[in-house]
């Protein structure tokens, strides 16, 4: 039998450490393939060996990166605005869970500049992290303004077991194909908005209308921005739960061909009977696709919904609820995590 060399021992020890850390950081797991995860870097402000901020870890990744690099973010509250710039794709951000790893800031005023977290490139994975915009959450005295927690602008994103916390315009899901699974999204006004092509599966949508600030009469969950009949965008909510405080619409049309589908989801009594608003597409209701199919709960009664609510068969709906809506070429199955 060969002796154990220092090199072999160190390499084996490193692999064991990574495995232990992977199991400790969220429920999505690394599949163990060194060919898929090329490098792991760590953020821990309390250890001089590692990066002190999330942004400094991202800054260390070379432009035009083509290999998956994992950023393990230690538990804690990170008070910083974080941006993944163009040309820095294939980043896997892994936190310790939504109650443990929190990136929070309080910028506000404009949707395109206020985000706590902004991601431009394609090929991004996020697990076990809360992105929070603190503006208007802890104070009822501030005027309501756009205050984005996260702005997603790239293609092929998988966001698992994460949280987006804010009040107005919490999640700016604007471009690309995105898969959100077991996420929590909180807010009061248009708190999931944009033009992306996304499936939200097993997610919890938490309303905080009437609390911060108290003068809001009712809120809106979605404001989807599909703007033409050929636009592939749309928000699909599959097996989700809507709950929280106050009353809200399921959505309002931000653009003329807005598309939102709720499938097999549970609505609490927070949902207003009318359900939806044509908003920016008034007079063009025939272009809007707002669907509720197989939903349950007190708020799922559609007898008093808007008369132009889309009538869809199960066959019609399944073309959107199937993962092929965002994943015709199988990119999700090629990701270096299991979820």
Curated annotation (Swiss-Prot):
Glycosylation annotated at which residues?
Answer: 112, 322
Which Enzyme Commission number(s) are listed? 3.1.1.11
Involved pathway(s): Glycan metabolism; pectin degradation; 2-dehydro-3-deoxy-D-gluconate from pectin: step 1/5
Q: So which residues are the signal peptide here?
A: 1-28
**Keywords per UniProt:** Aspartyl esterase, Cell wall, Cell wall biogenesis/degradation, Glycoprotein, Hydrolase, Secreted, Signal
Transition state stabilizer, annotated site positions: 168
Where, by residue number, is the active site?
A: 169, 190
Reactions listed under catalytic activity: [(1->4)-alpha-D-galacturonosyl methyl ester](n) + n H2O = [(1->4)-alpha-D-galacturonosyl](n) + n methanol + n H(+)
Matches recorded under InterPro entries = Pectin_lyas_fold (IPR012334), Pectin_lyase_fold/virulence (IPR011050), Pectinesterase_cat (IPR000070)
Q: Which domain of life is it from?
A: Eukaryota
Q: Name one GO cellular component term.
A: extracellular region
One GO MF term on file is:
pectinesterase activity
Question: Which positions in this protein are listed as binding substrate?
Answer: 116, 252, 254
State the compartments where it is located.
Secreted, Cell wall
Q: Which GO BP terms sit in this record?
A: cell wall modification; pectin catabolic process
Q: In which tissues does this protein get expressed?
A: Expressed in siliques.
Describe its function: Acts in the modification of cell walls via demethylesterification of cell wall pectin.
Q: Which PANTHER family match?
A: ACYL-COA THIOESTER HYDROLASE YBHC-RELATED, PECTINESTERASE 10-RELATED
Name the family the entry cites. Belongs to the pectinesterase family.
This one is known as: Putative pectinesterase 10
Instruction: Give the species.
Output: Arabidopsis thaliana (Mouse-ear cress)
Q: What is the lineage of its organism?
A: Eukaryota, Viridiplantae, Streptophyta, Embryophyta, Tracheophyta
Name the gene. PME10
